[in-house]
Amino acid sequence: MSQQLPVRIATRKSPLALWQAHFVKDALQAAHPGLEVELVTMVTKGDIILDTPLAKVGGKGLFVKELEVAMLEGRADLAVHSMKDVPVEFPEGLGLVTICEREDPRDAFVSNTYNNIDELPQGAVVGTCSLRRQCQLKEARPDLIIKELRGNVGTRLQKLDDGNYDAIILACAGLIRLGLEDRIKSAIEPEQSLPAVGQGAVGIEARLDDDRLRALLEPLNHPETANRVLCERAMNNRLEGGCQVPIGSYSLIDGDQIWLRALVGEPDGSVMIRGEVSGPVSDAEALGTQLADQLLNDGAKEILERLYAEA
């Protein structure tokens, strides 16, 4: 690829996906003045299938397959993802090459009536499509009625405003990026709801043999975020985590030490397996795998085997 060719970003058409694509475009052009960057928009299966829970129709990979095909066929050079939506495995020839600085990784409590989970009345209806959020909500408040909630951020907020739910749970990062932070009644601390693996971080997937592109992307990589996300993903990879199972994790870096907390739960919140681990940042991925093995030994293995068998 010559220096003159534009960089083509494959992206979904949802407002948040377009925000992420423009974020990467702007960062590339700021780092490399004069570089041409184009957006190649496309619709994925995940954008089309809105009447079925993600866990039942193939999981998060539904949002990335078309983008990956475009890269493999040479119609696009890179794809920008919310890290929480990036599957464990990549097609041969593709991989995660850059992780950008993380936005707020917490879940957001959104309601027109109540300020937080504790204020919800008995039997309140809460909307989420995440088994991870569902199991933690049900553990804290078994009385709550959890209803499926699909669609992009604007669609979900409209369903709340139409009175279908007393509250909904979204990612803080998505609301902040779309300029909708005023809809966040309260951020849910990790102690109450562990976020998804990589939540709040933007990752860039590209062809592994594209050395020119990888060099262009180097200034966008944020080492601290990358270490945190790689630690969380190593844990998730060892658990073979996907949409079908409730897995939460959250990591922090303090100096040269990284700390990781994670959980695996029954969807109804009746059983929650939790653990944490800490060690040198240089061992981030090994620590993630270590914590996964700890969770598996503590009972997560049985939960995961049953849920995957039912999926």
Curated annotation (Swiss-Prot):
Q: Which Pfam families match?
A: Porphobil_deam, Porphobil_deamC
One GO MF term, please?
hydroxymethylbilane synthase activity
User: What is this enzyme's EC?
Assistant: 2.5.1.61
Q: Which family does it belong to?
A: Belongs to the HMBS family.
Q: What does this protein do?
A: Tetrapolymerization of the monopyrrole PBG into the hydroxymethylbilane pre-uroporphyrinogen in several discrete steps.
What InterPro entries has UniProt attached to this entry?
A: HemC (IPR000860), Porphobilin_deaminase_cofac_BS (IPR022419), Porphobilin_deaminase_N (IPR022417), Porphobilinogen_deaminase_C (IPR022418), Porphobilinogen_deaminase_C_sf (IPR036803)
Q: What is this protein called?
A: Porphobilinogen deaminase
Which PANTHER family does the entry mention? Answer: PORPHOBILINOGEN DEAMINASE
Q: Which UniProt keywords apply?
A: Porphyrin biosynthesis, Transferase
Give the species this sequence originates from. Answer: Aliivibrio fischeri (strain ATCC 700601 / ES114)
Q: Which gene encodes it?
A: hemC
Q: Which GO terms describe its biological process?
A: protoporphyrinogen IX biosynthetic process
Q: Which NCBIfam families match?
A: hemC
Miscellaneous note, as given in the UniProt record, is: The porphobilinogen subunits are added to the dipyrromethane group.
- Family matches, as CDD domains: PBP2_EcHMBS_like
Reaction(s) the record says it catalyses: 4 porphobilinogen + H2O = hydroxymethylbilane + 4 NH4(+)
Complex formation: Monomer.
Disulfide bonds, paired cysteine numbers: none
